[in-house]
């Protein structure tokens, strides 16, 4: 009985996704429930891979810079204007 309810719930989520709603966190742009699940998994895995390549410090520093960006200027421009130190040497990938 539980699997019938699960299937019904998935069908409802799929219908909503096909109508253009995002039903899976990170699944923005997917045209079906399965597509949104795949997008979310890929985005999560991509971020994890970058974190492993750059190391935790570099990944955190990159996030600081990205968080400073606005519609008018990049994070680097804003950091320079406001005198915020961003240590880009931490970005180097591990070899």
UniProtKB/Swiss-Prot annotation:
Residues 40-64, 75-95 have a biased composition (Basic and acidic residues). Residues 1-10 have a biased composition (Polar residues). Residues 1-95 are annotated as: Disordered. One of its GO terms (biological process) is response to abscisic acid. Induction: By abscisic acid (ABA). Pfam families: LEA_5 (PF00477). Expressed in dry seeds and immature embryos. It comes from the Eukaryota. Disulfide bonds: none annotated. Belongs to the small hydrophilic plant seed protein family. Em protein may act as a cytoplasm protectant during desiccation. The induction of Em proteins by abscisic acid may be mediated by the cis-element, termed the ABA-responsive element (ABRE), which binds a Leucine-zipper protein, Em bp1. This is Embryonic abundant protein 1. The gene is EMP1.
């Amino acid at each position: 009985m539980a699997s019938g309810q699960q299937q019904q719930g998935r069908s409802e989520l799929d219908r909503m996704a096909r109508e253009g709603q995002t039903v899976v966190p990170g699944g923005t742009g997917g045209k079906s429930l399965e597509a949104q699940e795949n997008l979310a998994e890929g985005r999560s895995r991509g971020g994890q891979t970058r974190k492993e390549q750059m190391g935790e410090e570099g990944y955190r520093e990159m996030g600081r810079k990205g968080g400073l960006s606005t519609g008018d200027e990049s994070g680097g421009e804003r950091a320079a204007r406001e005198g915020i130190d961003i240590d880009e040497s931490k970005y180097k990938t591990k070899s």
